Amino acid sequence: MDIRKEYLEFFRSKGHEVISSMPLVPDDPTLMFTNAGMVQFKDIFTGAVPTPKNKRATSCQLCVRAGGKHNDLENVGYTARHHTLFEMLGNFSFGDYFKEDAIAYAWEFVTVNLALPIDKLWVTVHNNDDEAFDIWSKYINPSRIMRFGDKDNFWSMGDTGACGPCSEIFYDQGEENFNGEEDYMGGDGDRFLEIWNLVFMQYERTADGKLNPLPKPSIDTGMGLERVIAIKEGVFNNFDSSNFKPIIKKIEEISSKNATSENIGSYRVIADHLRACSFMLSQGILFGNEGRPYVLRRILRRAVRHGYLIGFRKPFMAKLLDTLIEIMGGHYTELVENKNFIEEQLTLEEDRFFKTIDLGMSLFNEELEKTKDIFSGVTAFKLYDTYGFPLDLTEDMLRDRGLKVDLAKFDELMNNQKAMAKAAWKGSGDTSNEGDFKQLLEKFGSNEFVGYNNTTYKSKIIALLDEHFKEVKILEKDSTGWVMLDKTPFYATSGGQNGDIGALEDNKHIAIVEETTKFHGLNLSKVKVVNSSLKQGESVDAIVVNRNEVAKHHSATHLLQSALKIVLGDTVSQAGSLNDASRLRFDFTYPKAMTKEQIDEVEDLVNSMIARGISGNVEELPIEQAKKKGAIAMFGEKYGDVVRVVSFEDVSVEFCGGTHVRNTADIGSFYIVKESGVSAGVRRIEAVCGTAAIKYTKDIISKMNEIQAEVKNSDVILGIKKLKEQIKDLKKEIETSQSKTSSPIEETIINDTKVIVSVVENGDLKKIVDDTKNANEKVAIFLLQAKDDKVLIVAGSKNTNIKAGDWIKNIAPIVGGGGGGRPDFAQAGGKDTSKIQEAKTKALDYAKENL
């Protein structure tokens, strides 16, 4: 049985509209990831957006709980049902049906469609929810209905807002299978497994804690697909179901090791984390050092560490992707469409971690031998900072041994170094003004953007806000604040395009528009009042400046993406962008630096597209029709049922809400200024076009003229080559001079080994040591030099019993220093030049004792 399909079709038959899973990156600044089915309907439940015509919806939502408030990462592999990524089935009513129908639908699906035995089912309701109790009593013996308090059976979005009692359906997995102390209804054991939660949103909680009945109660339900599949297949652990078992078998195959009771946890971790990493990558989340990218990195590295435990020493995750696609690719086509990209990114990140994991594990095991109760916070930090071990990975390794990290010391080091993981999520968002924006939205509604065809517009000021987003009636001269126009020509920052700037004018006053941003559906422009004042209710001329230049760069970005796909291949995808009047920046997925030839080819391709004078076309299409047309969507972006599509004939077709030129010829010319790396697997191109390109070429010509004058040669390249030759010759002279020391290097023979211990006044110590080792088959050399009130020490050893690193460690403290290195080469520094001769003597004594 395809339970996912069965569920969606069941609720479709009950008048529900089937809604696709929303992106894992939610359009909600308070959430790290989409973590429940109701997230995409939150604005409907709160009244922030109008209720749709069809007040019934159903979905199968991909969810991630591995960061922020909801984090199951540390439990994965140790329990039967925790996952970093899971699917949540849900049905929703927006002021339509309520408890009677919600319970009836749930009971029908569970007992008829799933055919679960009634004598295995239990139900919970809130202590005070007699209505739900009475309804359930029609379907199940009241002795199987349990009442619980707020902790278990009351749900709310937050301290205020929509909330209500909930009712949960449990499945009894059998006393014969689970008979521990916690295996009772309401206990923490695994015998009674919650499979479905029905939330009855019937109240609004106010700031004083009062519960006011909602005029139109709603329904929000959630059922974990993985749990239901396990129940239907008669297994007691989600990882033993058909959702995971094929992946675990594939791990056994490629590792040539069968899972055992001792190591099965590692196989389960890898299977789970493969799913999370693959879906996150497919939706444009890339590996990085902060925010969501860092969570992705933590998940992947945890999987690699468990792979290491079962014998993997090189990248292996990509080899599992085909198996995952066989299981989930039929419903989630993004896995198939982005298969090559996912494999590429997994392999790159795994390879990076495998290069340091041996060293990190050695350090970990070394510290572990010294640990009794608390693992060193200093070592945990070094594992993180030097070897790329996330803290929770170290904690995970200690968990099996019953040990903990000295978190106080770890945090102290992190704070001192301002480590990037200290505040892992930059996008946490400031929600302190959310109530103010909601009030504005309720008061005025969303204001209309009219700027696609207008750069000037007669608008009315419907709201003014001060710098802290508090509503005011007037903004005085020289003050800064925010303006909400009834109809605005100013484009708000989104989709990689910077918000418009410009001015608000009339006969009396002028305000400079410094930026335009969207807050909770409101287009607001930040203004600086430079003359007179701005008052609510007044009409002004809204004037956009530099729009044409911004449009040129945005359209050029679309052409650039097409050119990159032609030159580098279709696996290239957008990872971010920025467009303003002076430049464009385009981030894209590619595993290595572009060659000069590739950069030139891309630049030439874009300029040829510009020269063709291709007409632009903008249309709004149903999303499925747009996809069939080949429109490229930005990974991670949230789209509605109808999307805006910008196309330049067959050259470029993209989902886009930004502003563009009418014809590619309007762009003028295009120059790539820089190609660089952003992170592993992500490259960045910076480019200019239009007026900015003219300025760029003028600057280049000006600099060339300056260089020409400096090198005193009409052929600049030839002049630079001559200068480089002169510099090379001068460097040789300096090196020769430095290698000639003012004091002779002292040599001696100890047990057939040449030993050099000397104080050198001038010269490059490292070069002298290297040259000496190259010139001798068997030699030990120890050089000291006083320079700028400091002591430099360099030691080398070739085919002798002396280890240079140990030699340095023993002598450097004499001059107040420290250092170390390899057995064949080491160096150190010291502060006390007065002890240099003593150090020399001790160094020679050390050689005599060890040879």
From Swiss-Prot:
CDD domains: AlaRS_core. Keywords: Aminoacyl-tRNA synthetase, ATP-binding, Cytoplasm, Ligase, Metal-binding, Nucleotide-binding, Protein biosynthesis, RNA-binding, tRNA-binding, Zinc. The gene is alaS. Catalyzes the attachment of alanine to tRNA(Ala) in a two-step reaction: alanine is first activated by ATP to form Ala-AMP and then transferred to the acceptor end of tRNA(Ala). Also edits incorrectly charged Ser-tRNA(Ala) and Gly-tRNA(Ala) via its editing domain. SMART domains: tRNA_SAD (SM00863). Its EC number is 6.1.1.7. One of its GO terms (molecular function) is zinc ion binding. It comes from Aliarcobacter butzleri (strain RM4018) (Arcobacter butzleri). SUPFAM superfamilies: Class II aaRS and biotin synthetases, Putative anticodon-binding domain of alanyl-tRNA synthetase (AlaRS), ThrRS/AlaRS common domain, Translation proteins. Zn(2+) binds at H554, H558, C656, H660. It catalyses: tRNA(Ala) + L-alanine + ATP = L-alanyl-tRNA(Ala) + AMP + diphosphate. This is Alanine--tRNA ligase. The lineage of its organism: Bacteria, Pseudomonadati, Campylobacterota, Epsilonproteobacteria, Campylobacterales. Belongs to the class-II aminoacyl-tRNA synthetase family.
